[in-house]
């Protein structure tokens, strides 16, 4: 094979990979659009009247996750299953965002942390890498940390809306998250930096709870702060 033939062959490989990446980008753009729609819907809970609409907003968000499933099913077909991490950077951030959105819905519904397995059911993907397109553990953890930041904001807006018990519940939840993350030996630099922000979320929520307790807005909050 001549030198020119070698490079022609290599160009064929490069062009084929570029085609794959372009197909992936198209699907990811659709995922990003749906994620924005879900986020816009859920952001309404931060508004005064939004607290009364939480069940309706969560139900609507779950309907949008049906569209997410469709897009992810399409994405799986765009590349060989064994090359997941070769193209992972294309969908990593939107997948983390979708984990956060799923976790936010579950928290608003039950005030509990969604499991990684439950997220994969909501998204229609696999929990284990051996089964193909899956939810990477670090992507799950990143989404959970985004949730913590969102909940710290919600604690402040809850007070504005006159919901004085919600910040206490959020404080308990975020402190449990913090305790959980302390058990992990995080090697990923990006994940470690995001985890560093969790302590500020914890502090922000605790300040809200403390402010409520000293102002005597509700006995539940005051009693909890005294116990601390």
UniProtKB/Swiss-Prot annotation:
Entry's Gene Ontology BP terms: regulatory ncRNA-mediated post-transcriptional gene silencing; siRNA processing
What InterPro entries does the record tag this protein with? Translin (IPR033956), Translin_C (IPR016069), Translin_fam (IPR002848), Translin_N (IPR016068), Translin_sf (IPR036081)
Q: Where in the cell is it found?
A: Cytoplasm; Nucleus
The disulfide bonds in this chain are none
TM region(s), chain numbering: none
Question: How does this chain assemble?
Answer: Ring-shaped heterooctamer of six TSN and two TSNAX subunits, DNA/RNA binding occurs inside the ring.
Protein name (record): Translin
State the organism named in the record: Homo sapiens (Human)
């Amino acid at each position: 094979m001549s030198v020119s033939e070698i490079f022609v062959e290599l160009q064929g490989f490069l062009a084929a990979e570029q085609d794959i990446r372009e197909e992936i980008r198209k699907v990811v753009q659709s995922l990003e659009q749906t994620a924005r729609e879900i986020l816009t819907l859920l952001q309404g809970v931060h508004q005064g009247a939004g607290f009364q609409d939480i069940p309706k907003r969560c139900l609507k968000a779950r309907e949008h996750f049906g569209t997410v499933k469709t897009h992810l099913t399409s994405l799986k077909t765009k590349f060989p299953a064994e090359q997941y991490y070769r193209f992972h950077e294309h969908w990593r951030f939107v997948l983390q965002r979708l984990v956060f959105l799923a976790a936010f819905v579950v928290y608003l519904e039950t005030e509990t942390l969604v499991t990684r397995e439950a997220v994969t059911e909501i998204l229609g993907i696999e929990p284990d890498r051996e089964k193909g397109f899956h939810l990477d553990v670090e992507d799950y953890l990143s989404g959970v940390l985004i949730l913590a930041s969102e909940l710290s904001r919600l604690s402040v807006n809850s007070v504005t809306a006159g919901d004085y018990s919600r910040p206490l519940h959020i404080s308990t939840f975020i402190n449990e998250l913090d305790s959980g993350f302390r058990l992990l030996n995080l090697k990923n630099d990006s994940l470690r930096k995001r985890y560093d922000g969790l302590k500020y979320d914890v502090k922000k929520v605790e300040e809200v709870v403390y402010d409520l307790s000293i102002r005597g807005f509700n006995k539940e909050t005051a009693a909890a702060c005294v116990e601390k």
